[in-house]
Amino acid sequence: MKKSNFVFFSGGSPNHLYDSIHDSDFSTELHDVEKRGIIAGCSAGAMIMGEKMIKGVGLNYLPNTIVIPHYGESFYSWISSTVKLLNRGKYKLLCLEKDTYFIKDGDQLSVLGKQNVHIIYKKEHHTFTDGDTID
């Protein structure tokens, strides 16, 4: 891993991913990978990028943020509704629709994909599409 420039986390259980990674040599090395390359994830792999998850904490690559994948998909709609109620404005919600991604470069996020990324914070709801940047 010392020469890796790309790490991808797939879906599954976000809590299992976090428990397997945090406070490990792998976690320490991830920060070095971030400096020289890309850390990516989908579904649960995206959820662990935030500071907080629906249950538990994340890896904090996005401070003050909860990442919600599958946003708008009917099966997962209860998750985003529940998080909005529980959140009460403490964290930003970064909600990803299907086939849509964000790229973090420093403090800026760029949107890439077929659908939208939503940032929900308190009573504000902003929608971003392919090519948009988020400060």
Walk through the language-model features, giving the residues of each.
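Short, basic, helix/turn surface patches
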Residues: 12-16, 122-125
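C-terminal and late-domain segments of enzyme folds
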Residues: 6, 53, 57-135
